[in-house]
C-alpha cells in the first residue's frame, strides 16, 4: 500500500485538515493516478458538514479529479454492481444497488472511499475517463461533475437547434449549462435574481438575460420556453418557473433545495408540462461529454487554489463568491 497525503474532515463541525492514509495496491484492472487538479463541488460542503445525513468520517472529499500522465479523469463514482439493467445500459449512476461514490462511499471489500483532495488515487480502469490534451488543464476537472450534471439532462430531453432553453441560476452548474445549451444550438436565456450576472451571462454565450424579480419581464416570458434547467439550490418557488414553459415543456431539476418544494398540479396539467430530475451521467456518456468539450473547446471557468485554502474556499462558495468553480492544485500538497 502507498501513503497518500490528503485533506480530510474528521467530523461534521470540524474544518478540513491534513490527513495521511493508505491507498490500496493496484489490482490487475486498476490504474494508479497521480492527481493534478481536483474541482470543489458544493456537494463536498454538504457531505463534509453532514448535511445530507449519510456522511462517513474521516472524509476526504473530491469527485472532480484530473490527473497527469495519460490525461485521465475520475468523476463521481468508482464502481457499481455492473450487473443490473441500469449498469448494462450505461446508467451506472442509477445502479440498482447504488454506485460506489468516489468519496464517502464503501468499496465492495468494506473499506471507505477517499476522494480527490489527495495526491493520488487507485481506480478500476473501467471507471476512468480519457481527457483530450486540446483542453486547458485547469478547467477540465469540474467537467466531471458540473459538466456532466448539465450535459446529461440537456441531451436526455433532446435539446436541439432553435429550442428555447432557460437556465435558472448562474453558478457552477448554471455557467456550464449555458455553454452546453449554446453549443447544442438552442436560443438561451439566463434567468437570475442578480442584475450583476448579466454581463457574465452574455460573455458565456447566453442570447438573453431576464431578471427574475422583474414582474413585467417574467409575465412576458410565460409559455415561452421548451426547457428550463433549474440549477438553484436555494429555496425558491417552482410554480413561477413552470408557468414559463410552453405546452409539452420540461423543467429539469439539478439543484437541491434544503427543504421540500411545493408543486401544484394545474401548471402541469393545463399545458402538459413535466418536471424531471437528473443525476450526473454514466461512464459512456461522461466520455461523450468530454469528447464534445474537446470538439467545442468547452471548459469550466475556474479559480485555482492551494490545498490549504480549502476552508476559506468553502466559505466563499456559500457566499456565491467564486466565478464559477474552485479547482485545487494538488502540487501544493506534495
Language-model features: where?
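C-terminal hydrophobic helical "lid"/dimerization subdomain
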Residues: 1-4, 239, 283-334
Amino acid at each position: 500500500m502507498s501513503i497518500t497525503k490528503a485533506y480530510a474532515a474528521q467530523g461534521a463541525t470540524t474544518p478540513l485538515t491534513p490527513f495521511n492514509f493508505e491507498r490500496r495496491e493496484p489490482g490487475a484492472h486498476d490504474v494508479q493516478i497521480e492527481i493534478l487538479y481536483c474541482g470543489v463541488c458544493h456537494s463536498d460542503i454538504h457531505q463534509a458538514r453532514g448535511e445530507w445525513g449519510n456522511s462517513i468520517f474521516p472524509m476526504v472529499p473530491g469527485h472532480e479529479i484530473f490527473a497527469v500522465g495519460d490525461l485521465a479523469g475520475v468523476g463521481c463514482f468508482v464502481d457499481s454492481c455492473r450487473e443490473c439493467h441500469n449498469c448494462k445500459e450505461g446508467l451506472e449512476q442509477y445502479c440498482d444497488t447504488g454506485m460506489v461514490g468516489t468519496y464517502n462511499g464503501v468499496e465492495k471489500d468494506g473499506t471507505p472511499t477517499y476522494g480527490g483532495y489527495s495526491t493520488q488515487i487507485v481506480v478500476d480502469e473501467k471507471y476512468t475517463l480519457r481527457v483530450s490534451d486540446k483542453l486547458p488543464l485547469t478547467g477540465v476537472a469540474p467537467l466531471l461533475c458540473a459538466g456532466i450534471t448539465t450535459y446529461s439532462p440537456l441531451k436526455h430531453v433532446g435539446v436541439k437547434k432553435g429550442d428555447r432553453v432557460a437556465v435558472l441560476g448562474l453558478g457552477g452548474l448554471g455557467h456550464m449549462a449555458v455553454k452546453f445549451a449554446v453549443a447544442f444550438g438552442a436560443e438561451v436565456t439566463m434567468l437570475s435574481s442578480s442584475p450583476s450576472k448579466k454581463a457574465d451571462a452574455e460573455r458565456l454565450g447566453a442570447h438573453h438575460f431576464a431578471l427574475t424579480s422583474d414582474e413585467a419581464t417574467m409575465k412576458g416570458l410565460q409559455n415561452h420556453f421548451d426547457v428550463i434547467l433549474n440549477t438553484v439550490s436555494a429555496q425558491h418557488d417552482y410554480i413561477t418557473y413552470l408557468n414559463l414553459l410552453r405546452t409539452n415543456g420540461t423543467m429539469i431539476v439539478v439543484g437541491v433545495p434544503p427543504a421540500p418544494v411545493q408543486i401544484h398540479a394545474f401548471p402541469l396539467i393545463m399545458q402538459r408540462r413535466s418536471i424531471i430530475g437528473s443525476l450526473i451521467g454514466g461512464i459512456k456518456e461522461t466520455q461523450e461529454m468530454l469528447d464534445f468539450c474537446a470538439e467545442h473547446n468547452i471548459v469550466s471557468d475556474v479559480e485555482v487554489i492551494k490545498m490549504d485554502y480549502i476552508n476559506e474556499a468553502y466559505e466563499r462558495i456559500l457566499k456565491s463568491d467564486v466565478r464559477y468553480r474552485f479547482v485545487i492544485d494538488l502540487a501544493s500538497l506534495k
